[in-house]
Design a protein with these regions (language model features):
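Exported/periplasmic ABC-transporter solute-binding proteins
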Residues: 1-211
Length: 211
């Protein structure tokens, strides 16, 4: 059975032995690697999104960090209109938020105007607010928002896989090191890490890594 409780909860369940495989949308931390083995099955770009009415089309990672930490507060400072920036993000414990804050080096420093509990809510909020900036899994981005290029690189399957789009995170299977999985769990693990799963992973919008 699959229980979607968030990355940190899934990792802790794997550590505690209350599940066979913990699923995470962030890399394991060093202390978690003390008891768990990390297997990357896919990559996901985290798109930086704005309202389609926003004339800004590109930001650097540094500018994104400065916006989210409150150092830059007006769109005019990055080539946009004279409007106060509304910073939209995910709730604490979200793998997307963890990935975004890790890559932009803004952990514990982000000043969010709104912290929302789902990617869909972030997209809807940004779509309805011309001042807003948000982040969302590339696979979830809709035409109702505009995904920015980051350092001149557009988020796509190709740029995520070749590493030129830098705001990306891994999807991880976390298993207890040195412990055998049950027959059913091992069968799932073998399938998920094989090229046979690539079509399913791609259909879900992530970038498969198995050859």
């Amino acid at each position: 059975t699959y229980n979607p409780t968030g990355s940190s909860t899934g990792i802790q369940a794997a550590i505690d032995g209350t599940c066979d495989i913990g699923l995470s949308s962030r890399a394991l931390k060093d202390e978690e690697k003390a008891t768990l083995t990390e297997t990357i099955v896919a990559l996901d770009g985290i798109a930086i999104i704005v309202n389609p009415a926003n004339p800004v089309s590109d930001l650097s990672v540094e500018q994104i960090a400065q916006i989210y930490t409150g150092e830059i507060t007006n769109w005019k400072d990055v080539g946009g209109d004279d409007l106060e920036i509304s910073r939209i993000g995910r709730e604490a414990g979200s793998g997307t938020r963890d990935g975004f804050e890790t890559i932009t080096d803004t952990k514990e420093a982000c000043k969010y105007n709104q912290e929302l509990t789902s990617t869909g809510d972030v997209i809807t909020t940004v779509a309805g607010n011309p001042n807003a900036i948000g982040y969302a899994s590339l696979s979830a981005v809709k035409d109702s928002v505009k995904a920015l290029t980051v350092g001149g690189v557009a988020p796509s399957e190709e740029t995520v896989l070749d590493g030129t789009y830098t705001i990306q995170r891994p999807f991880v299977l976390a298993t207890r090191t040195g412990e055998a999985l049950s027959e059913a769990a091992q069968a799932f693990f073998d399938f998920a890490t094989s090229a046979d799963a690539n079509e399913i992973i791609a259909a879900a919008g992530a970038v498969p890594v198995a050859k």
